[in-house]
């Protein structure tokens, strides 16, 4: 069927612009309303009093410093630390009390692509087992899909070396 259509004339279609749209003056850039809050790290409280932190798109094999603010939590005191259940890919750097709650800074390593969730537990110094679970969710892109626009509060701090067999220093046996 596809071979039968080869001899047909190609269809010509036109594009019409709405009135007031200048085709020559348009650019290939996407512009968003300045009032949108899509460019910040989103922190939402879940039903079980844990927090979900959405950090947007990240690139695989890169390390990021993520800073966000948790609202005041009555179960935490001023002396907050990471619970002794460390995550391999998410490391707590600091927790500082601020008027809005707690400013949390952590380092995230994007180790594989897809929608990834890593957890840290925040505990009180000398507390009686009171912990708050914080889940950081990231959408990690592979290295062939460009560089993502990072949200406010997300900063790239380094790239991990990627093993590629074509760039090996080994020349084989002599």
UniProtKB/Swiss-Prot annotation:
One of its GO terms (molecular function) is protein phosphatase 1 binding. Its main location: secreted. It holds the Pfam family DUF4517. One of its GO terms (biological process) is positive regulation of protein kinase A signaling. The modification N-acetylalanine is found at residue 2. InterPro entries: ADISSP. It is found in: Secreted. Keywords: Acetylation, Phosphoprotein, Secreted. The modification Phosphothreonine is found at residue 147. The keyword Nucleotide-binding does not apply. GO terms for cellular component: extracellular space. The keyword Acetylation applies. Adipocyte-secreted protein (adipokine) that acts as a key regulator for white adipose tissue (WAT) thermogenesis and glucose homeostasis at least in part through activation of protein kinase A (PKA). Belongs to the ADISSP family. This is Adipose-secreted signaling protein.
